[in-house]
Amino acid sequence: MKNTFSRLFGFGDKESEFELQDESHEEIAKKVYEEIQEIPIVNITPNRYQPRTVFDDARIEELALTIRTHGLIQPIVVRQYEDDKYEIIAGERRFRAATKLGWEKVPAIIKNLNDTETASVALIENLQREELTAIEEAVAYQKLIELHNLTQEALAQRLGKGQSTVANKLRLLKLPEEIKSALLEKSITERHARALIPLKNEELQLKVLQEIVEKQLNVKQTEERIAKLLEEVKPKRKAKQKAVSRDARIAMNTIRQSLQMVANSGLNVNSAEEEFDEYYQITIKIPKKK
């Protein structure tokens, strides 16, 4: 059975091109672990394709304590991009923990990968850990789509996820930066953010975001608030006006002018006009006595 990494390392549209077809797990493992070195930490840089933008300092501290006690059991994975310069492919949390411990060198597996492969490994390695925020996950999906020229459906198949899951994550990227930041900082949940999408209007979205944070609205309260706002901004349907023929307008104006002439003669005439779907009705009351 081929692993997720092998299915995603490739180019073009055909699924076969995303797979390492003729290599066993043992051969792949041999390639991965063929070179381990102690590399100076100052010569290592974070992965430019790292989808994770928020690192929990408390958890890094916990990891550092574990490494101090048991050592670094799993080396980080890097690639060399210049003489004595290395970029992390996988294991940035371990790298940060080792740095926190004051290590001068860290054991690393050196792999020969190009930019596309490096990005794919970094993105998938983080996606598999399921520790990313919803926005970080959405960014990872978008980068994989761009790197491999995939459709949402194709990406979902390769990750073993439903297409709706991928689509819902990607919709979050259309939200204003303030809302995406709130998601990253975990001030709101993914369901809060998804509820804001139908508003469309950025000003309204930010207004509701402020209400969610300040009033600690739960998801149901947020959805009810948004439903009310959508009802308020819904354009009112104008009553359909039927076209009035030229002859009808002439007739109405003639009657009005005649009534005005009678009134000018000193006779107190009362009239009332009513408009129906198919006709106008004019009621005229003329007193018998002046």
Curated annotation (Swiss-Prot):
Keywords: Cell cycle, Cell division, Cytoplasm, DNA-binding, Septation. Pfam families: HTH_ParB, ParBc. Residues 153-172 bind DNA. One of its GO terms (biological process) is positive regulation of sporulation resulting in formation of a cellular spore. The keyword Cytoplasm applies. CDD domains: SPO0J_N. It is found in: Cytoplasm, Nucleoid. One of its GO terms (cellular component) is cytoplasm. Gene3D superfamilies: 1.10.10.2830, 3.90.1530.30. Belongs to the ParB family. HAMAP family: ParB_Noc (MF_02015). Effects nucleoid occlusion by binding relatively nonspecifically to DNA and preventing the assembly of the division machinery in the vicinity of the nucleoid, especially under conditions that disturb the cell cycle. It helps to coordinate cell division and chromosome segregation by preventing the formation of the Z ring through the nucleoid, which would cause chromosome breakage. This is Nucleoid occlusion protein. It comes from Bacillus mycoides (strain KBAB4). The lineage of its organism: Bacteria, Bacillati, Bacillota, Bacilli, Bacillales.
